[in-house]
From Swiss-Prot:
The keyword Protein biosynthesis does not apply. PANTHER family: BPS1-LIKE PROTEIN. Its main location: plastid. Expressed in roots, hypocotyls, cotyledons, leaves, flowers and siliques. Keywords: Chloroplast, Plastid, Transit peptide. This is Protein BPS1, chloroplastic. Pfam families: BPS1. It comes from Arabidopsis thaliana. The gene is BPS1.
């Protein structure tokens, strides 16, 4: 399979950040390491749950819903960790802020792209509903309208979405953010950067699967290497290896699309074409297509809700960070005035 961009040879150009959490600061580490261990244990568990029970579950809207729901939980988890670390924005180094803002805006762009594609797929649902209505009428004139609607639907499904086409560039730039910034004299900062690394890896891989499914191109699929020192590394590699191997086989098939529920509708449409052309439809033969259309529509709605949830979590995190930065700036100005008391306000994530 093609890769959007080979990841850097080493994700840690400034040295191994994991060894920085050493016993030199044993008193502080004894408080911080349980927080990190708990976060990474939960991360490993959430990643393990993404391994499909059956190969047929890969590239389904149900898996996509589960994956996006899992991302929401993980990103809420990092917000909780920041609060538990008692690491106010006033203690953040500028480069941490830059990294957070840069990554979050790219992820928001991906969310917008995924939402636009889900909306586009839902627009195709209207064509299917109109076609089914005419197929049930089962008259020559109605069957002609039905075939026209189904032809339009097929063209709609295979058409390109510019926002999805742009995902490859966004994913490639996100790969570069896997390099961890150097942290000086802040054990809390080291814990945060290590935790963020796990969040970024999970988010990047899942986003790549979404982009591959929506674009029909394996070039968006990620191949990431992670350190064996990480407690979630084995779970992640299992998910990646299992998913990538089967997705490769799916892309080698001759289906209209790679998304399972979407392909089920396309297959149902194809089976009805001979009867449409003959001018007569057995009402019973319509039921499988009706069921497939309903399953696809319901699934898309559920995935859309989870993507929207993820978008709101990202946006909330950015807004809170920016609000705290503005508050810090205001406090600095107030501190220079003899009429105002000095101090910095902090609101947790």
């Amino acid at each position: 399979m093609a890769r959007p961009q080979d990841p850097p040879r080493g994700f840690f150009p400034f040295g191994n950040p994991f060894k920085n959490l050493s016993s030199k600061n044993s008193v502080l580490s004894s408080k911080l390491l349980p927080l990190l261990n708990n976060f990474e244990t939960n991360l490993a568990s959430s990643i393990s749950k993404l391994v499909p029970k059956e190969k047929s579950d890969i590239l389904t809207v149900s898996w996509m819903k589960q994956a996006m729901e899992s991302l929401c939980e993980t990103h809420n988890g990092i917000k909780t960790l920041i609060t538990d670390l008692e690491l106010p924005v006033s203690d953040w180094e500028d480069k941490w802020v830059d990294v957070y803002l840069d990554i979050s805006v790219k992820l928001l762009d991906l969310c917008n792209a995924f939402s636009s594609e889900l909306t586009r797929l839902n627009q195709g649902h209207l064509l299917l509903q109109f076609a089914l209505h005419n197929l049930e009428a089962n008259s020559p004139q109605n069957l002609s309208k039905a075939q026209s609607s189904l032809d339009s639907w097929k063209q709609h499904i295979v058409s390109k979405n510019p926002r999805i086409e742009n995902c490859r560039a966004i994913l490639s730039s996100l790969v570069q953010t896997l390099n961890l910034p150097k942290v000086k004299n802040s054990a809390k900062g080291k814990v945060l950067m290590r935790a963020l690394y796990g969040v970024k890896v999970k988010t990047l891989y899942i986003s790549g699967v979404f982009a591959a499914a929506f674009s029909g191109s394996s070039q968006n699929l990620m191949y990431l290497t992670v350190s064996n020192e990480l407690p979630w590394a084995q779970s992640f590699m299992e998910v990646q290896n299992t998913m990538n191997a089967e997705i490769k086989n799916i892309f080698l098939s001759d289906g209209l699309t790679v998304l399972k529920e979407l392909e089920a509708v396309a297959s149902g449409v194809k089976k009805l074409y001979p009867a449409i052309q003959q001018g007569s439809i057995d009402p019973i033969s319509l039921q499988p297509l009706k069921d497939s259309v309903t399953e696809l529509s319901n699934g898309i709605d559920l995935v859309s809700k989870e993507v929207d949830c993820f978008f709101k979590i990202l946006l909330s995190g950015r807004d809170t960070l920016l609000e705290n930065l503005r508050s810090m700036g205001a406090s600095t100005l107030q501190a220079t005035s003899p009429k105002k008391a000095a101090g910095k306000n902090y609101r947790g994530f």
